[in-house]
Regions:
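Conserved catalytic scaffold of divalent metal-dependent phosphoesterases
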Residues: 1-10
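Active-site neighborhood of phospho(di)ester-bond hydrolases with catalytic His/Asp-centered motifs
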Residues: 9-15, 30-33
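Acidic, His/Gly-rich catalytic cores of divalent-metal-dependent hydrolytic chemistry
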Residues: 23-128
């Protein structure tokens, strides 16, 4: 745990729903999405990231995970037919966006693209 007052270099969230990578000055904010929940982008894919040390920095690669979403939806309906997330596995759209900011609501149904970002060495050094 970082002591109060010490700078934070990077924040990496987990099971975060909406995948993205953002640099804020020398700092990094990364959310890999979730393997068990589509990204509200109209595709049934889950998401994960691989972080790897590279010459010049840290490579952060965002990957889509295709899986048997129809079987997952069927299994969910078998145990809880009233839970709306079975449809989410099929459509890639969340049943509720009440807690989402308007900017993220507008992105609903727009497919997320896999990609890679290099967090450069000089930004890492500046954050130390």
């Amino acid at each position: 745990m970082t002591p109060p007052g010490d700078p934070i270099d990077a924040v990496i969230g987990g099971h975060s729903g909406l995948p993205f990578t953002q640099t804020l000055g020398s700092r990094l904010w990364h959310k890999p999405g979730a393997i068990g929940m589509p990204a509200n982008d109209g595709t049934p894919r889950g998401w994960y990231s691989i972080l790897a040390a590279e010459d010049g920095g840290i490579d952060i690669a965002l990957h889509a995970l295709d899986y048997d979403h129809a079987a997952a939806a069927g299994a969910l309906r078998a145990v809880n037919p009233d839970l709306p997330y079975a449809e989410t596995f099929e459509t890639g759209l969340w049943p509720n966006m009440d807690v989402m900011p308007e900017s993220e609501r507008r992105e609903r149904g727009r497919p997320t693209a896999p990609g890679s970002v290099l967090w450069p060495e000089e930004r890492i050094a500046a954050a130390e």
